Amino acid sequence: MSQEKNEMFESEWSKEREREKQLASGLDTAEKALKAESEELQKSKSELICLYNEVHNLPGASESRDHFLIACDLLRRENSELETKVLKLSQEFAQLNHFTLRGKTAPSNLITSENICKDPESNEPVLEIEIQSPKEEREELCPKLGERKQKEIPEESVKEGSFPREGQKEEGSQQNQDMKDEEKEQRLTMKPEEVVRLREELSRINQSLLQSQSSGDSSDDSGAQYPSSGDKLKYNQQGEVQQLHQNLHRLQILCNSAENELRYERGKNLDLKQHNSLLQEENIKIKIELKHAQQKLLESTKMCSSLTAECKQSQQKIKELELEVLKQTQSIKSQNNLQEKLAQEKSKVADAEEKILDLQRKLEHAHKVCLTDTCISEKQQLEEKIKEATENEAKVKQQYQEEQQKRKLLYQNTDELHRQVRTLQDKENLLEMTCSQQQSRIQQQEALLKQLENEKRKYDEDVKSNQELSEKLSKLQQEKEALREEYLRLLKLLNVHVRNYNEKHQQHKIKLQKVKYRLTNEVELRDKRINEFEDEIGILQHKIEKKAIQDQITAQNDTLLLEKRKLQEQVIEQEQLIHSNKWTISSIQSRVLYMDKENKQLQEISLRLPATKKQKEIYSTEVCTCNNAELQHEDESVPKATEKWKHSEQMETTISDILESEVVNEILPLSNSSFSGKGLVESFVSLQETDDIKSKEAMASSKSPEKSPENLVCSQNSEAGYINVTSLKETHGIQEQDQKSEL
């Protein structure tokens, strides 16, 4: 039920908001129309003043002045009526603004009503307050609507003394507004009393709950030895008590929100008072302006009286002229001319009268549209005045007919009359132009009146919508009464539940104490276990950290050991290379020395014991082959093998030269013998340098184990060469022994 009511509230408030928006748009249009009307009224006032000045400046046109004065009076009355309508519209606009401000505060009340519907048991008084507030607004709006309807009824009579009456009406409306403001203040002062009453009720409920709890505690102490088995009922009752506390808290919050709303409304009322004071100041200014306008009208009436005096003076002058006409009865021709001119003037006067009648008809038609009853009386007055004017015209015509005989001597004044007639014609043309302008303005005012009628229709529609809202408010009041009944029923149920709770609370208190003891013991045991587990966790974490550090250290040691092994292998390989290189160098040096010695011996033998050419050639070929074989075995891995081959070829050429010429053998210098030895030493040194370079490259690239077999091969080749040299030495030794035996 509460949800359905909430939905109903929301739908109604949404509709009211849409209507308020429509009213706001209508108010804006009304404001614009009022501004336009005020501007047009000011323009019409200025134009009327100009017309008055023109009429006063017209000399010798008394009849036309009377007609125009009548028309000006009518226009003044119309302006006064329009001003009254403008004031009414402004008052209605202010009232509608006040209504829209109240409508804006309505959504905040809606939010509070939604919260209240959720808790119908605890928030019943707040609903009553909120339902009373739209009632009060309705009561305030009803007299306002009646006043508006009364203001819409057209006034039956508008006379010359309308200005002071309008001022009295404005003062009466201001007094009514002041009375309404005072009533609102009194209502606002009453609302805090309701808030105080709600607070007292809340305090009473709190006290009753505290007393029930205290009585429950005392009964628990007395009946501690009789435990019962209604645990479920106990928990349910505790939940109900908690809900009651929550409801009380919500009531306190709602009271605070109501106080804030009251403060907000008071501030609003102060703002409205300021606004009313400003409006009063504006009304005072408008009154002052009206007084100035009245003073100007009085001045214009004085000017009219002065013009009437001038007309009388002109009539006296005309009489004097008539006397002169009686004396001058000589010119008959001038009489005829004057008669013709008078006939023309009469025709012009008739035309002017017809135009005036047309203007009067148009004005009467405009007055019929604006004012129904007042125009009839004014028309009668105008008809009487017109009759009087026609009678005066007839009398004047009779006087003119009587005085035709007397105007025979006015021939001298004809030129002056011609001039006056021309000036009058010009002024008549100007007056016709002004009349046409006034007609156009009257049409504009008629259009404005139509707009105002449309706005009145809209206002009637708003009144109907307000009636519908009043019906809805009556429905809400009925719902409020139903909620009140539900509230009383719930209060009775609450009292029953509280009694049951007090009875059962005594039984459950003992069980709660036992459960508390058990829980405290279990909690202490759990705390001890938790502390033990925390200590064990700290120890395990410390061990885990140590293991992680040890694993890191072992991993780093493994990597370092692998690097160390690699470096040791590289160092061993380098040492082996150095050792092999040293051994090869020492073996080569020994061989070189041995070869030098053999060469010296061979030179000595070749000098001492000349043999046959064939033996020498065989011996030289054997030596060359041996040397070539040694050089090939030693220099396979060396890039400078070509140089050694060149040295061997040079040796062959030298040996062949020695065998060919015996003379040269005796004079052979020692440089040739030393040449081969030194060249071999240099070649061995170059080989040693190349080996050092290769050993360094092996250290850098760490790939020396692949080169160790080559070194072994070189060493084997060098050993083979050494064996061959020894065998050659043995052969040389055998040959020397044979030669000695032959000698």
UniProtKB/Swiss-Prot annotation:
Region of interest called Disordered, as start-end residue ranges on this chain: 1-25, 114-193, 208-233, 695-715
Species of provenance: Macaca fascicularis
PANTHER family: COILED-COIL DOMAIN-CONTAINING PROTEIN 30 (PTHR34479:SF1)
Stored InterPro entries: CCD-Prefoldin_beta-like (IPR052825), DUF4686 (IPR031476)
Coiled coil, from the record: 21-98, 165-580
Family label: Belongs to the prefoldin subunit beta family.
Biased composition (Basic and acidic residues): 1-22, 133-193
Record keywords: Coiled coil
Compositionally biased spans, kind Low complexity: 208-223
Name this polypeptide is given: Coiled-coil domain-containing protein 30
